[in-house]
Amino acid sequence: MKIGRLRVDPSLFEVRFAAGCDTRRCAAACCRGGVWLDTAERDRVVAHAELVQRVMDPGQPRDPRHWFSRRVVADADFPSGRAAHTRVRGGRCVFLDGARRCVLQKASLAAGNGLQLKPYFCTAFPITIDHGALMLDDEDYRDGQPCCGATRGGPLTVFDVCRKELRHVLGRLGLSRLRRMAVRNRRNRAPC
């Protein structure tokens, strides 16, 4: 099954979540190891360093040279084909403030002009793209999060919990197509 260039991983139809799961209450548990972002996103953040610095906590590093690792990797899942990683400080992404809020998101909101500094895959989490497959982030979500995670027999579907994130990745039409796939999948699995 495909939507555009993306293969749809069956986990999107099979994984269930616990009652009460809501990605808006996550307290940034997913940010603990930093994040991969397109090199163009990294460059945009550095170009707006002054805006980012204004919303940082006093203990966060102000020097943009300390925000990203120097290593750049080839990765076809990113628009430019190249990805960089945020640095990790104190066990979490360097852009996470003391209240566990993303300063890139805060800076974007402070700009008030539609500027998007928060990386694409941060906004999409727990949905990710891995080797051209649309899927749940294995490392973080399948093993469970302190705030919310996949569970056997849970009452909520990926669509219940991740609709906003799926729309971010697929767009409105892509989400509608994925929903139809899920309905067909449910019918095919229904006991006779």
Annotated model-derived regions:
Residues 1-92, 96-192:
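Short loop/turn segments that flank or connect secondary-structure elements
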